[in-house]
From Swiss-Prot:
Chain's role: Catalyzes the thiamine diphosphate-dependent decarboxylation of 2-oxoglutarate and the subsequent addition of the resulting succinic semialdehyde-thiamine pyrophosphate anion to isochorismate to yield 2-succinyl-5-enolpyruvyl-6-hydroxy-3-cyclohexene-1-carboxylate (SEPHCHC).
Organism: Bacillus cereus (strain ZK / E33L)
Entry similarity comment: Belongs to the TPP enzyme family. MenD subfamily.
This enzyme's EC code(s): 2.2.1.9
Signal peptide span: none
Gene it is expressed from: menD
Cofactor(s) needed: Mg(2+); Mn(2+); thiamine diphosphate
Gene Ontology BP terms: menaquinone biosynthetic process
Domain of life: Bacteria
Enzyme class label: transferase
Coiled coil: none
Protein name: 2-succinyl-5-enolpyruvyl-6-hydroxy-3-cyclohexene-1-carboxylate synthase
Keywords noted in UniProt: Magnesium, Manganese, Menaquinone biosynthesis, Metal-binding, Thiamine pyrophosphate, Transferase
Record pathway: Quinol/quinone metabolism; 1,4-dihydroxy-2-naphthoate biosynthesis; 1,4-dihydroxy-2-naphthoate from chorismate: step 2/7; Quinol/quinone metabolism; menaquinone biosynthesis
Lineage, top ranks: Bacteria, Bacillati, Bacillota, Bacilli, Bacillales
Length: 584
C-alpha cells in the first residue's frame, strides 16, 4: 500500500511539476473522485493557479478563454466517464481556432475496463481528430525511469499543442485506489527532474529568396491588389500589414478579429465597411483585383467570402504558418508556409514603393461614403442592434476588450465596429462558430483582459447560464450586454424567415425568460435599459466597477430586420450613385 502511494505521489508530482516548468501554470479543475491525486497535487504546487468549475462543459470553455487571452497553454482536468465527454465542444472549438489546451482525464485502471465497473467508459482517443495528439499515460510506478517518462511525455505533449497550428492535446491517466497522495514525502516535486527542461523550440520558416524575388517582381506589376486580414493571434500584425499596404498601395480589408481596425497604428489603408458595400452588384461586377493576399482565418463577412469566390482570374495567396489550406472559397493559387510577420517583413524589405493609385482611392472613397450612411443609425431612437456595437465602443476605455458572441453580435461587430484610435481588442469563438460556452469563454478571458464587455444574444446567454458561476467563485470582473430579441434573431435574415407557418416554432424559438433572477442568484447586478443614454451609462459603469454586471437591451426581431434592410438599401443607393458618377 505504501509503495503504491509513494509511486502515485512521485509519478504524478513529476508530471505536475513539469507542467509548471514548461509555463503551463493555469488549470481549470472539475471536481471528481478519480482525478483526486492530480487535483490535490496541482492545488499544492506553488507554481500552479487553480480554478474550480463544477460544470465540465462550461469548464472547458472557461479554460479556452484563459488560453485565448494568455496565448499559451492551459490545463483542464476532470474525472472519468461522461465528465470527460462534456469537454468535447470546447475541445472542438480549440482545435479549429488553434488554441492550445492540455486536456487531462482521469480513468479507471485497465482491470476495471469493459467489465461493467461504475463510471468507466472507453476514453481512448475520446476526442478523435479534434486533438493534435493523444496519449494513454502509464500507471504510476516507483522508478526513476517512470518519473523521467512522466516528464518527457509532458514535454512532448506541450510541444505538440504549441507547434503550428496550435491546438488541444489529450492525456488520459489511469489510476488505482487509494487516490490520496502523500505530501510528507521528501523532494515531492524533484523526481525525474534533470538540470535542463526539454523544450521544443519552433523556429521561423524562412521563405526562399527566389520565391520572394519572384513575388516582388509579380506584385510590382499588379496595381489592383487587396490585403485581407482575418482572425489572427499575432499582436504585431497591424504594424506589419499596414507597412506592406503602404509599400504596395493595396487596401487592407480588416476583419474585426484581426484587431487592425483599432489601435495607435496608422489606419489610412484600412477598409472597415466592406461587409456592407460588397453587397452592391455593380461594384462586384466592375471591381476586379489582380491579386489577393490573405492572412489569418477566413473573415466573418459572407459578402467578402462571396466576393473572393468570384475572383477566379486573380492570384490568391494564402499565408499560413502551418501550411494548412484554410481556403473555403476554393480559389487559392498559392499557399505560403510562413508566419504573417515573416512574409510581410520579406516583402517590405524588397518591395519598391508603389504609388497610391485610383484603385486604392476607389476603395477608400466608397468606404467613407458607406460609413457616413451607416452612421445615420446613431440617430435612431429605437433599439437597433447595430447601434449596440457603436455605443459600446464609444464608452469603452483604452485597452478594453470587446467579446462578440456568435450569431448576430459578431456580424453586427463586423458591420458597425468602425476604425478607432482607441486600443480595443476584439475576441470571439470563430473556430466552429457555436453559440455554446460563450459566457464561459469570455469569463476565462476576463482574468487577463480587464475590462471586458461581452455582447451576446438571449439564446446564447441561456445556453451557458451555468458559466456565470465562475464569475462568483473567482470574483471576476465582466460586463455582459444581453441583446434580448426573445429568440434566434439571425434566422430573420435567412431564407427560413419566409416559411411563416413554422418559423417561430422551429427558428424564431422565443423562450420568454426573465434573466434578472438568474443574474442575482450568481451575485451579479442586472439592469434592463430604456434608451441609449441609459445604455451607455450602464455599460460604462460596468466596465469601471468590479464584479458581474448584466445589461439587458430588449429589441424586436422584425423591427431590427427592417432597420438593417433599410440601412443596407440606402447604402446601396449611395454606392451605386457614386460608382455611376465615377464612370462618367
Amino acid at each position: 500500500m505504501n509503495n503504491h502511494i509513494e509511486a502515485l505521489s512521485y509519478y504524478l508530482g513529476a508530471f505536475v511539476d513539469e507542467l509548471t516548468r514548461l509555463n503551463v501554470c493555469d488549470v481549470v479543475i472539475s471536481p471528481g473522485s478519480r482525478s483526486t491525486p492530480i487535483a490535490l497535487l496541482m492545488e499544492q504546487h506553488e507554481g500552479m493557479n487553480t480554478y474550480l468549475h463544477v460544470d465540465e462543459r462550461s469548464a472547458g470553455f472557461f479554460a479556452l478563454g484563459i488560453a485565448k487571452a494568455k496565448k499559451r497553454p492551459v490545463a483542464l482536468l476532470c474525472t472519468s466517464g461522461t465528465a470527460a465527454a462534456n469537454y468535447y465542444p470546447a475541445v472542438c472549438e480549440a482545435f479549429h481556432s488553434r488554441v492550445p489546451l492540455i486536456v487531462l482525464t482521469a480513468d479507471r485502471p485497465h482491470e476495471l475496463r469493459d467489465v461493467g465497473a461504475p463510471q468507466a467508459m472507453n476514453q481512448f482517443n475520446l476526442y478523435g481528430t479534434f486533438v493534435k495528439q493523444f496519449t494513454e499515460m502509464a500507471l504510476p510506478e516507483a522508478s526513476e525511469a517512470m518519473y523521467h517518462y512522466a516528464r518527457m511525455t509532458t514535454q512532448r505533449m506541450i510541444a505538440s499543442a504549441c507547434l503550428a497550428p496550435q491546438g488541444p492535446v489529450h492525456l488520459n491517466f489511469p489510476v488505482r485506489e487509494p487516490l490520496i497522495p502523500d505530501f510528507s514525502l521528501e523532494s515531492l516535486w524533484d523526481k525525474g527532474r534533470g538540470e535542463y527542461t526539454g523544450v521544443v523550440q519552433q523556429g521561423n520558416v524562412v521563405m526562399p529568396s527566389e520565391y520572394v524575388d519572384s513575388l516582388v517582381g509579380r506584385l510590382s506589376h499588379m496595381e489592383k491588389g487587396l490585403i485581407i486580414c482575418g482572425d489572427d493571434s499575432h499582436s504585431e500584425i497591424a504594424a506589419f500589414a499596414t507597412q506592406l499596404a503602404e509599400k504596395t498601395g493595396y487596401p487592407i480589408l480588416a476583419d474585426p478579429l484581426s484587431n487592425i481596425r483599432s489601435g495607435h497604428h496608422d489606419k489610412t489603408m484600412v477598409i472597415d465597411c466592406y461587409d456592407t458595400f460588397l453587397r452592391n452588384e455593380l461594384l462586384k461586377e466592375t471591381w476586379k483585383p489582380d491579386v489577393l493576399i490573405r492572412f489569418g482565418g477566413m473573415p466573418v463577412s459572407k459578402a467578402l467570402t462571396q466576393f473572393i469566390k468570384k475572383q477566379t482570374k486573380a492570384v490568391h495567396i494564402v499565408v499560413d504558418e502551418s501550411g494548412q489550406w484554410r481556403d473555403p472559397a476554393l480559389v487559392a493559387t498559392e499557399v505560403v508556409q510562413a508566419s504573417d510577420i515573416a512574409f510581410c517583413s520579406a516583402l517590405i524589405e524588397k518591395m519598391p514603393v508603389m504609388k497610391k493609385n485610383d484603385w486604392f482611392r476607389m476603395w477608400q472613397h466608397i468606404n467613407e461614403k458607406t460609413k457616413e450612411t451607416l452612421r445615420e443609425m446613431e440617430t435612431y431612437d429605437t433599439a437597433f442592434e447595430g447601434r449596440v456595437i457603436t455605443d459600446i465602443v464609444r464608452v469603452l476605455p483604452e485597452g478594453a476588450t470587446l467579446f462578440a458572441s456568435n450569431s448576430m453580435p459578431i456580424r453586427d461587430t463586423d458591420s458597425f465596429f468602425f476604425t478607432s484610435d482607441k486600443n480595443i481588442q476584439v475576441m470571439a469563438n470563430r473556430g466552429v462558430n457555436g453559440i455554446d460556452g460563450i459566457i464561459s469563454t469570455a469569463l476565462g478571458a476576463s482574468i487577463i483582459c480587464d475590462p471586458l464587455v461581452l455582447v451576446i444574444g438571449d439564446l446564447s446567454f441561456y445556453h451557458d447560464l451555468n458559466g456565470l458561476l465562475a464569475a462568483k467563485l473567482h470574483e471576476l470582473n465582466i460586463t455582459i450586454v444581453v441583446v434580448n430579441n426573445d429568440g434566434g434573431g439571425i434566422f430573420s435574415f435567412l431564407p427560413q424567415y419566409e416559411k411563416k407557418e413554422h418559423f417561430e416554432s422551429l427558428f424564431g424559438t422565443p423562450i420568454g425568460l426573465d434573466y434578472e433572477h438568474v443574474v442575482t442568484m450568481y451575485g451579479g447586478s442586472f439592469s434592463r435599459v430604456n434608451g441609449w443614454e441609459q445604455f451607455r451609462e450602464e455599460v460604462q459603469k460596468g466596465a469601471t466597477t468590479e464584479g458581474l454586471h448584466v445589461v439587458e437591451i430588449c429589441t424586436n426581431r422584425d423591427e431590427n430586420l427592417t432597420l438593417h434592410r433599410t440601412l443596407w438599401a440606402k447604402t446601396q443607393d449611395v454606392i451605386t450613385t457614386s460608382l455611376q458618377g465615377e464612370s462618367k
